[in-house]
UniProtKB/Swiss-Prot annotation:
Protein name per Swiss-Prot or TrEMBL: Glutamyl-tRNA(Gln) amidotransferase subunit A
Assigned GO CC terms: glutamyl-tRNA(Gln) amidotransferase complex
InterPro entries: Amidase, Amidase_CS, Amidase_dom, AS_sf, GatA
Active-site residue list: K79 (charge relay system), S154 (charge relay system), S178 (acyl-ester intermediate)
Length: 492
């Protein structure tokens, strides 16, 4: 079959269980596509062909013996921030260019236990700090919809791989929008779960109180299948929450859009820099949800102006602490011929970290320094609580909150030169991480240049099933999620 890459996760699972095709055939199909198409997209950092075929053969044996799970034999790609035993894990940085993890991240462990086949590791912004996937040490990834544009970030490789049909779905992480924004830029569905829903064990840390892993795929249904595998408590992660996990696939029709109250924050639709096409597509999608029976309720989120300064104090502060472990001594990049220990530290870090990482470490170290700790970091944590309370107050009157996932569509590679401008572009996504809430991106159309636009729905704590269900029903009534970039239509 030449069009296996066009099948949904459900269709792939059915095809494998009914022996219409084998996991080896499916895996070989994707590996051929990667070999032919990825040199243009540059989504993969490492392709694990031999391991993938071994895993596919094991999956076929399990399917034959009747020992399969719902997803046995289906391939996926992992963001290169998840530790993978015996496979290079670089986090997009020269600092970890030769790091091979001795263990699997819990998310990777769970996908293996479910019989999923690892195609490889995909590109990302260095240490997940960025929203373009240009800061990666191995170079930029291209957006399959327009190869001279960025796919978003930091999970840009995950988004590009799925959008180019080089993987049926992928894992991502989201610290300030790193699943939702690239999903928006590449026309995909991406879910950022509640903080503590998915284990962070084995994810290379950026900002520990903000990082969360989640699925990226074409549809809410496809995301639900992966959530069923990766969600749940993990004793190895102290921030993982002991809470019963929903069957996200079974609950896809569990929330009725009829009577659903969708909050429309006044402040969100008056943000400077909100593109007219993005605003129009988001408003059209809300009108569609209204036609399906939802009620739109105007709400106030008065802390909106505080999002960016609060986030860009807390996230860099946590990053400067987390990244202090990379010193050229135990592992990671080590400079050549250091004059002394201080020279080893200085040069290993200045040569091993890229400019954006160094910028955020400097901001974070400054915010945590003795004279400024109370004025900056402590104050930012207090404002963070106010942002959380702002959302909780809104949820007293609405079920979900709607917003664009990004103020613009994807921009050209090399165009994002001003870091402050880039930080301001995170306005719609970062508050969700500050508050620890779940949120989802759904594709809702295109701008005048045929670049995808995304709608973001933000839910209350533990409402992943509700968000997936709403988007699933929206996708039953629209076809934006089925649209494919021209490069994805190519056959290997």
């Amino acid at each position: 079959m030449t069009d296996l890459h066009r099948l949904s996760i459900r269709e792939l699972a059915e095809g494998l269980s009914q022996a219409k095709f084998s996991s080896r055939e499916l895996t070989e199909h994707y590996l051929k596509r990667i070999a032919k198409i990825d040199p243009q997209v540059k989504s993969y950092v490492t392709v694990t062909s031999e391991q993938a075929l071994r895993e596919a053969d094991a999956a076929d044996a399990a399917l034959k013996a009747g020992n399969a799970t719902a997803l046995t034999g289906i391939p996926l790609a992992h963001k290169d921030i998840f530790c993978t035993k015996g496979i290079k894990t670089t986090a997009g940085s020269k600092m970890l260019d030769n790091f091979i993890s001795p263990y699997d991240a819990t998310v990777v462990e769970k996908t293996k236990a479910a019989g999923l086949v690892t195609l490889g590791k995909v590109n990302m912004d260095e240490f997940a700090m960025g929203s373009t996937s240009e800061s990666s040490y191995v170079g930029a990834t291209s957006n399959p919809w327009a190869l001279d544009h960025v796919p978003g970030g930091s999970s840009g490789g995950s988004a590009a791989a799925v959008a180019a049909d080089l993987a049926p779905f992928a894992t991502g992480t989201d610290t300030g929008g790193s699943i939702r924004q690239p999903a928006s830029f590449c026309g995909l569905t991406g879910l950022k779960p509640t903080y503590g829903r998915v284990s962070r064990f084995g994810i290379i840390a950026y900002a520990s109180s903000l990082d969360q892993a989640g699925p990226m795929a074409r549809s809410a249904e496809d995301c639900a299948y992966l959530m069923n595998v990766i969600a749940g408590h993990d004793a190895k992660d102290s921030t993982s929450v002991k809470k019963e996990v929903d069957d996200y696939v079974a609950n896809l029709n569990g929330t009725s859009v009829k009577g659903l109250r969708i909050g429309i924050p006044k402040q969100y639709f008056n943000v400077a820099g909100l593109d007219a096409d993005v605003k129009a597509r988001v408003e059209e999608s809300l009108k569609k949800l209204e036609e399906m029976g939802a009620t739109l309720v105007e709400i106030d989120l008065n802390m909106t102006e505080a999002y960016v300064p609060t986030y860009y104090l807390i996230a860099p502060a946590e990053a400067s602490s987390n990244l202090s472990r990379y010193d050229g001594v135990r592992y990671g990049y080590r400079c050549e011929n250091p004059a002394d220990l201080m020279d080893l530290y200085k040069r290993s870090r200045s040569e091993g970290f890229g400019p954006e990482i160094q910028r955020r470490i400097l901001i974070g170290t400054y915010a945590l320094s003795a004279g400024y700790y109370d004025a900056y970091y402590v104050k930012a944590q207090k404002v963070r609580r106010l942002i959380q309370q702002d959302f909780l107050k809104a949820f007293e009157n609405v079920d979900v909150i709607a917003a664009p996932a990004a103020p613009t569509t994807a921009y050209k590679i090399g165009a994002s030169l001003d870091p402050v401008e880039m930080y301001l572009g995170d306005i719609y996504t970062i508050a969700v991480n500050l508050a620890g809430l779940p949120a989802i991106n759904a594709p809702v159309g295109f701008d005048k240049d045929n670049l995808p636009v995304g709608l973001q729905l933000i839910g209350n704590y533990w409402s992943e099933s509700q968000l997936l269900s709403i988007v699933h029903q929206y996708q039953q009534n629209t076809d934006w999620h089925t649209k494919r970039a021209a490069i994805a239509e190519e056959n290997a």
